């Protein structure tokens, strides 16, 4: 993962989680006319295949990572530095019923289990994050950013999940002017299984 910018970066930090230096959280600070803007770029651990932290170390690590995410943002909130923040990245959790092709069939599948959804909700509450995508696309509508390589025809089967997210703090909501998931990119030659997610901020 990386953060690329045409604008100068004032500060860049790689935040450590679970005593691992694998660069899963890059924080970048920009100077803007309205004050500092912090962008948090995340790649949350996928969690393996078995949604049981007692027998799956990868899943236990994912839950611990989410706990530390929450603690990190609560610390930012206590320091009163939370005004202009954007969170982006592959969070490897599809929290809503219509963020997956079948909530019933995936409820015990890693990325859509209750324990992950609850942990992500705590992260979101830690800084009053707003899930921008669902301000543009109602929660009652299907919305995906990822389709498995295993599907013979990903577009026809459309068994996707919304694993990639953009959140903003309340102070930035009025500046958000557009949102889009570039679904067609999934059909390019040798594509990623994730489609680009775009946010326009005025």
Regions of interest found by a model, annotated:
Residues 1, 84-86, 160:
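A residue-level structural signature of the nucleotidyltransferase/glycosyltransferase Rossmann-like core
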Residues 31-33, 75-79, 126:
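Alpha-helix C-cap/termination motif
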Residues 44-67, 104-109:
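Surface-exposed cleft-lining segments at the edges of enzyme active sites
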Residues 12-15, 96-202:
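Metal-dependent phosphoester-hydrolase catalytic domains
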Residues 1-52:
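Structured beta-strand-rich core segments of catalytic domains in phosphoester-bond hydrolases
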Residues 43-45, 92-94, 136-138:
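Catalytic metal-binding/acid-base residues of hydrolase active sites
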Residues 39, 69, 73-97, 132, ...:
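Active-site beta-strand/loop signature of hydrolases that rely on acidic residues for catalysis
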Residues 20-22, 60-69, 112-116, 159:
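Soluble or luminal CAZymes and related metallo-dependent hydrolases
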């Amino acid at each position: 993962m990386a953060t690329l910018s045409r604008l100068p970066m004032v500060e860049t930090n790689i935040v450590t989680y679970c005593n691992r230096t694998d660069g899963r959280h890059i924080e970048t600070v920009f100077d803007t006319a309205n004050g500092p803007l912090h962008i948090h770029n995340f790649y949350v651990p996928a969690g393996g295949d078995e949604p049981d932290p007692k027998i799956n170390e990868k899943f236990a690590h994912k839950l611990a990572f989410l706990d530390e995410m929450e603690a990190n943002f609560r610390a930012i909130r206590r320091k009163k530095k939370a005004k202009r923040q954007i969170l982006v990245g592959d969070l490897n959790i599809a929290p809503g019923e219509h963020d997956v092709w079948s909530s019933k069939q995936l409820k015990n599948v890693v990325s859509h289990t209750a324990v992950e959804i609850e942990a992500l909700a705590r992260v979101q509450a830690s800084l009053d994050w707003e899930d921008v995508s669902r301000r543009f696309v109602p929660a009652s509508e299907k919305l995906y950013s990822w389709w498995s390589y295993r599907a013979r025809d990903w577009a026809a089967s459309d068994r996707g999940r919304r694993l990639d997210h953009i959140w903003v703090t309340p102070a930035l909501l009025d500046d958000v002017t557009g949102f889009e998931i570039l679904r067609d990119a999934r059909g390019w030659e040798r594509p990623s299984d994730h489609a680009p997610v775009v946010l326009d901020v005025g």
